[in-house]
């Protein structure tokens, strides 16, 4: 029917998994036209960006997408160009978005583009864990307001080194729910990584605008205070860096300044922020330089003083460099605190509830047993989530927060 042929699509880079999915669809009388043996990170048939209301995936853990993996470089990353395939896709009415997607992939295959370069968080990288790229892939596939569910290792949710990923996703989708799975969930598949189910909803256009407005307001409220800290740090270090904390250098520089020639440390500048995640722009500090002009009648004296000052400064260059390094370290600490303050304020302005659960049983044992005899808290969990959804729809008033019951241990 229409649901199977026009609404359900699936892809897997493991041929056996793809065949099993196709057979399952056939056995349920749903056909299998949308199921493909293909790399899930690449478009195929009706699978392309911005098309789906719902995406579900369980990406492989412990593997990486490397820069050596190219579009069209293997059977599962091929880009079909045969006339029958093109005609079939056009007859299904995928329209301009599909045409543009297929054109991009053909260009990528012709130029042997690394798969990583198709993704913002992969572009220019030597490798990325597969599950991280799948987070971006799923969000790309969704329409604005579309929902996704993904199984992720818990390290993605709490490892400090992956804070950038969480912040990246936070700026593109709302976190709906996190369900921490018990350790035995994947033991029968020889997976030892603790995992969780993560549910996200891609921003609508209105939510994207609200997110950007929150950042604009946060910058308005926060930036000036941290700029003052940068100015104070500069004022504290500048004379010491310029003179290398040497008394003779300080004296000579003072005499030159009286004649109109100064040795100065330039004001700090804002650098270029990385593409992701959002953060305060890094502070850039240049090296000392000479500034000013000496009157003609003082040039001979100034030339001699400058020669002496230059020689003296050369002797304390290491100290000056060390002080400059200290100042840059201070700037880095200010930048990090600035970023933390921005994120804290944005999260206050763009605050919303998240459903979190940690069931002890999910219908599977450590040996892979399933069925009616295996305990599962998931039905009760679903009921609780429906209550949570209803509460959100009613305005999420604190006084009406659902009082979820303890899960049954039976």
Please give the residue ranges for each predicted region:
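Residues at the starts of beta-strands that form the adenosine-phosphate
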Residues: 5-7, 147
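Conserved SAM-binding motif I beta-strand of class I
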Residues: 8-12
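Conserved hydrophobic residues forming the short capping helix/wall of the S-adenosyl-L-methionine
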Residues: 25
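Conserved SAM-binding strand-loop segment of SAM-dependent methyltransferases
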Residues: 31-40
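Short loop/turn elements that flank and shape the SAM/SAH-binding pocket of Class I
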Residues: 41-45
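A conserved structural/catalytic subdomain of Rossmann-like adenosyl-cofactor enzymes
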Residues: 49-410
């Amino acid at each position: 029917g229409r649901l199977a042929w026009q609404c359900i699509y699936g892809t897997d880079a493991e041929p056996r998994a793809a065949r099993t999915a196709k057979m399952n669809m056939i056995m349920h009388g749903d056909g299998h036209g949308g199921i493909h043996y293909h790399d899930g990170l690449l478009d195929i048939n009706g699978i392309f960006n911005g098309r789906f209301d719902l995406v579900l995936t369980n990406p492989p853990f412990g593997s990486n997408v490397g820069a050596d993996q190219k579009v069209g470089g293997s059977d599962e990353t091929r880009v079909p160009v045969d006339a029958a395939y093109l005609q079939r896709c056009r007859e299904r009415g995928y329209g301009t978005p599909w045409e543009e997607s297929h054109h991009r992939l053909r260009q990528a295959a012709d130029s042997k583009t690394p798969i990583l370069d198709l993704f913002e968080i992969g572009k220019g990288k030597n490798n990325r864990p597969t599950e991280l790229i799948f987070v971006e892939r799923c969000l790309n596939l969704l329409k604005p307001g579309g929902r996704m569910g993904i199984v992720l290792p818990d390290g993605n949710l709490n490892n400090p080194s992956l804070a950038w990923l969480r912040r990246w996703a936070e700026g593109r989708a709302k976190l709906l729910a996190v369900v921490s799975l018990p350790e035995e969930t994947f033991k029968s598949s020889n997976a030892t990584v603790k995992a969780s189910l993560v549910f996200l909803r891609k921003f609508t256009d209105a939510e994207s605008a609200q997110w950007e407005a929150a950042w604009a307001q946060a910058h308005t409220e926060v930036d000036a205070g941290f700029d003052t800290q940068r100015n104070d740090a500069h004022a504290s270090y500048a004379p010491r860096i310029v003179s290398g904390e040497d008394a003779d250098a300080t004296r000579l520089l003072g005499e030159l300044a009286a004649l109109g020639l100064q040795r100065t440390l330039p004001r700090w500048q804002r650098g270029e922020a990385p593409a992701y995640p959002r953060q305060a722009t890094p502070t850039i500090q240049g090296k000392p330089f000479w500034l000013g002009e000496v009157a003609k009648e003082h040039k001979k004296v100034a030339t001699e003083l400058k020669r002496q000052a230059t020689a003296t400064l050369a002797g304390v260059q290491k100290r000056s460099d060390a002080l400059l390094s200290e100042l840059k370290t201070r700037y880095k600490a200010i930048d990090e605190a600035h970023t933390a303050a921005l994120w804290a304020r944005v999260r206050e302005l763009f605050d919303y509830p998240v459903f979190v659960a940690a069931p002890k049983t999910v219908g599977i044992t450590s040996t892979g047993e399933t069925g009616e005899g295996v305990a599962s808290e998931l039905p009760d969990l679903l009921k609780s989530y429906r209550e949570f959804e209803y509460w959100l729809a009613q305005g999420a008033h604190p006084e009406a927060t659902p009082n979820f019951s303890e899960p049954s241990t039976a």
